[in-house]
Amino acid sequence: IDADGPRRLRLLVAPDGSAELQVLEHRIHGDTPWAVPLDLEPVPSEHEFLFHKTTVREVYDNARHRFPDAPDVLLWNERGELTETTTGNLVVELDGELVTPPVLCGLLPGTQRAELLDTGEVVERVVRREDLARVDAAWMVNSVRGWVPIEVDSAARPAGVSSSGA
């Protein structure tokens, strides 16, 4: 592998058992919080592909296309419950606890999330959109990037919309 800087590996396995190894750029996030918009549309909490790590990423891709300049997008379901981001699980500090939404809200049960629950570092609790006003801190977590601090960017504009709303 001829690479400048950190890389991550992705192993894709097809239904016929064939495999492909991809080498991808690994962005280092640093300590600066990512400005993450709240998606415009809810995700269906029972969408079958939200619960499995797969290349079928339509729900995530659609959110990213709505906000192409954002490093990530915060998702929520039809009940107004926060779920995850397009690249990882959500952890928020709320009422003095580190909280992650339950899988039944419609999200991938990531390996980093599972470890945090197993060690008791986080607890599961429904986090509603209106709870964002009370959140003391928030992170996107996954096993590749670790804990990435995020802040909800209410000023973010979807693709094709200027800051004047035109």
Residue ranges and their predicted role:
Residues 1-166:
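Helix-start/capping segments and mature chain N-termini
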